Structures are given as C-alpha cells and as structure tokens.
Amino acid sequence: MTVVFDRPLAESPEGWSASLDLVARSRRGRTVLDGNRHHGPLRVQRPFYPEGGVCHVYILHPPGGLVAGDKLDIRVQCDSDAELLLTTPSAGRVYGSNQLRLQQSQQLSIRVEAGARCEWLPQESIVFDRAEAVNRLSVSLAEGADFTGWEITCLGRPASREFFDSGSLDQRWAIYLEDRPLLLETSKFVGGSAQLQAPWGLAGATVVGTLVTTCQETSPEQVREAIEVILSELRLSAQQAGREQTESKPFEVPLVAVSALPELMVIRVFGQRAVDIKAVFTGLWRILRLAQTGQDAVAPRIWFT
C-alpha cells in the first residue's frame, strides 16, 4: 500500500525540489539497487557491502542543507528478501527560512515486502533558528517484513550560542503493517516557546531522538537492560570529562524511555549532545541486528570519517 498524509506539502514559489527513487532487490543472496532515479540535487553513491549481502546506501544532498522553499522527496522500495541499510554521510541542516516563512521539507516513503529488512539510520539533523522544517516518514510493511529506523534532531546549536528561538519543526511518522497502523505520530516544536523548557515539554533538552523497530527477537526488558549498560558508560565518560549531571544540567546523560506497542517498539531519547544519543541508538541497533540475524552488525564506514 501507499501511505498518504492528510495534506500534501505546499508547493513553494522558491527553493529547489529534488526527488530520489530507489528499488532494492535480492539477487543470489546479495541485495542490489535495481532502480535508482533522481531529479535535482539528491542522489546516492555506489552501494557498499561491508557485511556480505547487505546493501549499504548513502543518500547525498550536495547543497548540504535546506533553505527556504526546498523540498526533498525520497521513495524506497525493498522487494522480498532484500536487506537494505540507508544512511547519510553527514549531519543534515535546515537553515533559517526567509521573510515569507517558506517551508523546508523532507518526505521519505518506504515500502518493505515480505522477508525484506530495511534500516533507515541517518546522521543527526540540525534545525537552525527561524527554520520552518517539515519532516515526514511513512513506512508500509508487508507481513513478514522488518524495519528499524531513527531520527535524531538538534534544535539549534547551543554549544555555539545558536539557539532555537523562533521557527518550527513539524514531524510526522506513519508506520503501517499492510493497512493496519502501528504508529501514527505528530510532533511540533516551536522555537522560543515554553514547550522547550517546561517539564511537560522538553525540559531544556536540545536534542531529541526516536528509534522504532519491528524486531520481535528482542524483548523490551532486554532493550532496557542494554540501555542501562550504555547509559552507565556515558555517565562514566561524562564524569571523566568533568561533565557532572546536576539539577541545572539534567541531560549530561540522556533520558531514555521505551514503549512496547503491539508489533513495534519505540525508544525516545532527550539529551544535550547528539553524540550521546547516537551512542544509545547505535548500541541498540547492534543488539537488534544480532538478535535478528545471529551476526554482528557492521556500521557504515562513513560514520567514522
């Protein structure tokens, strides 16, 4: 099925529109890109195979960020038994919009067929002050398909004294198993609002992350135990670096919550440093992959360059 959101993204009189269509197929135990069509400044490098037949694909946006009116539309089809990992070579950026407050949008639509596994593991996105960011993810799964994906979003760059004082970020996730919704979620963050500091909101956290997985081989209890091990390591690193967690600095170590939904697990993280949230998510990804395949995951080498 095709997931359609309630309203299409508004057409912009300015900005660049770019699209990318990918089709991944399994051939003789190896996943290949059998379809690769792009329009505008959005494309992929050649596939990489650091772990046997799993296809690693880096999605490139040469301009390096979204400005007023830019629109990215990415569509991915994973045919039966394909194993596809999608990532990005560097942090994404959504810069301040113009006086017309034109949206800067990215829509990613993924279809995963029976027996296939798709992983969407991008590097973090930085939403700058005055941005009007829209980020939409729609995933359609066949019975017997697997999906793991995450998003890590930095609201401003406080370490550089660049705060998210105005603008907005509108995030929408829709994950379906055939015609049945597993997750429908809308989040909106408004720059400079009480939501960013209030206890009922982000409570001062400037980096937020969400990981979702259909992995049934790992229980929520195992995930929570793994998270505690990762957080213990982060606490030790923070202490060694002199970053003690205090009441005025509650997110020197991230806050993590796990929700076990029917056929889907959702992990949410609040923090102050993207690198810490990436440590949580990559650690969990390795555990999930080992449980699913019985083999250790090999991280994309672009993450270390």
Language-model-derived ranges and their functions:
Residues 96, 153-305:
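A structural signal for small-residue-enriched, beta-sheet-centric alpha/beta enzyme cores
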Residues 78-80, 88-90, 112-114, 122-124, ...:
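Short, structured patches in soluble enzyme cores that scaffold and shape functional sites
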Residues 22, 74-76, 110, 139, ...:
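Preference for bulky hydrophobic residues occupying beta-strand positions
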Residues 1-124, 129, 136, 286:
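N-terminal, charged/glycine-rich beta-strand/loop interface patches
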Residues 83-85, 117-119, 146-148, 209-210, ...:
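Structural motif
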Residues 2-3, 9, 17-19, 23-39, ...:
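N-terminal intrinsically disordered, cationic/polar leader segments
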Residues 22, 50, 54, 115, ...:
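A generic structural signal for ordered alpha-helices
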